[in-house]
Amino acid sequence: MSYILVVDDEKDIRDLISQILFEEGHTVKLAQNSTSAIDYINREEPDLIVLDIWLKDSEMDGIEILKSVKQNNPLCPVVVISGHGNIEIAVAAVKQGAYDFIEKPFNTDQLLLVIDRALETSRLRKEVYSLQNKEINESKMVGGTGAF
């Protein structure tokens, strides 16, 4: 299935999300702070990131990690979670490129629905991007402009 990185400073939350996703057939990596999250992201390029906004004892908060992810891998969907949910946080996360926002405590069905939608949307975006690049390359090979 998919490689998903879960970033949360709370071990119980990381373990719960990991178990849910593992049971759905996903490969899951865990990070408890911004340093380990950025390290995983730079080494392995996850298919999706589940990211807590408030990371205690971290150099970066979730919004800063989100900005970094979107600069380096704009097609990677990020689902933001927070136990301190308010509309301002959700709006800020979506403005920075988050796919969706889930408030803790969440229910399993909600989490899986959002993750499945995010993965499918990402797959379709990558497919469109690939087809566009293929068309551009074919157009260059025949010396055309791609226009009819």
Language model segments and positions:
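Two-component/phosphorelay signaling modules centered on CheY-like receiver
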Residues: 10-29, 43
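A Lys-centered signature of the CheY-like receiver
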Residues: 9, 104, 144
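Short amphipathic alpha-helix used as the core "switch/output" element in two-component signaling
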Residues: 39, 61-75, 92
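Active-site residues of response regulator receiver
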Residues: 8, 52-54
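AAA+ ATPase active-site-proximal loops
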Residues: 132-148
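Acidic, metal-coordinating helix/loop segments flanking the phosphotransfer/catalytic sites
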Residues: 30-48
